[in-house]
Amino acid sequence: ARLTTRFHELLTEYMVVAIITAEGLREKNLRGARMGWHILPELACDDRGEAIGIRRLITRFRGDDPAWVRLKQTHEPGGGSSPRARTREWSWPPGIVDHRLLFIYLRDVRTAHAHRAGLLPLHERIDLRTDTLALFISPRARAVRSEADAGGNFSRGILSDVFGRALFWMARDVLGRPGLPRSYADACKADSEFRGLFGAHVIRSLGATWWGGLRNRWDFAEAYTNDLQPTLHAFYSKIPT
């Protein structure tokens, strides 16, 4: 049981990092994402019609989704704002999000999380053909659930924290970046010069810098981040152009 629990923890962490990297949106979009609404897997099924794998996966977020998950609002002349009219569709390449592990996570790991959160009877398993629970189900039960977390969604900041820990590990242990704090916790302290560096928002800077600043593919950078070139150039890209 302990090994299974640990496997679920590690696979969840991998999925958080891989999906944030593949998607390019803000943390709130993925934190609020629900299966069947925003996460749309094309399933491979056996002769009985039961899901046995994922062929491909499409995500679909809209400007008129509920506030906790919708795309960033655009500002109108005069200071008003309205949701973007268009729908943003994207896909997760298997080179970033391993589809075999994704299937195990979506069906099996999320089933265990749903059981612990009280969202699914213990004798049932998530059926991906009809699944509408959160993409990232909090493994901790909550006594009171708002509409925003009715599907078991993680609390604010948790996804960014998981991504930040992975980014810190990569910078320190894989890339050997000198001068880093001794731990991720030290990097997050209020007086640390690295505070705010390790978090999910960094992937948007990386995307804008690589696709826009270095390769001058602002069209792709805009699609990846669902943001506009002036904003990406001013606040995200680290390459002056």
Spell out what each predicted region is:
Residues G24, M35-G36, E76, A141, ...:
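An acidic- and aromatic-residue-enriched active-site/binding cleft used to recognize and process polar
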